[in-house]
Amino acid sequence: MIVQAAGGIRVVVTLKDHRLDLEAMARAITPMTKLVFIANPNNPTATIVTAKEVEEFMARVPDRVIVVFDEAYIEFAQGPDFPDSLAYMKQGRKAVVLRTFSKAASLAGLRVGYAVADADCVALLNRIRQPFNVNSLAQVAALAALEDDSHILECLRMIEAGRHFLSDEFTSLGL
């Protein structure tokens, strides 16, 4: 939707073994490319691209191209191999990091998330966003979630228990 709204042409790069193919994504970048999206962890495959893979990819991305890291599921993928996407912003790269309160904080119905970006990008986003895109209740809930680590940990524990339950039930059905 973002690409179409901006009058751009979307280029889809096929997954390789259920993972983002950063090599193919780098090859797909042309002089017309303005934006690249990396969903990490990927949805729906839950696979990640590692810090090393992202570093190699970023070395091939021209400085003029904005790299958007969609990290909606970041709380489910912490570990030593997971890239620090915020570091690219600190290095002065054109990067945007998107995160949400929908998943780990269980606030999906409130439709609240955030972007971390440089001032120029934020100014651009403010020009195209809806004027009242996050209601007051969602803002209060998001702020409360930021201050309540135990809530996030409990939500993650419950989600993990649900995953194990589903896996066990599918196994018992022979699926």
Name each model-derived stretch:
Residues 12-17:
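Short beta->alpha connector loops at strand-helix junctions that form conserved
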Residues 35-39, 68, 114-116:
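Structural motif
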Residues 4, 20-32, 44-67, 71-104:
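Active-site pre-lysine segment of PLP-dependent enzymes
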Residues 1-8, 131-132:
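Substrate-binding/gating loop at the entrance of the active-site cleft, primarily
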Residues 94-171, 175:
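PLP-dependent aminotransferase class I/II
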Residues 11, 24, 28, 53-56, ...:
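Alpha-helical elements of Rossmann-like donor-binding domains used by nucleotide-donor carbohydrate transfer enzymes
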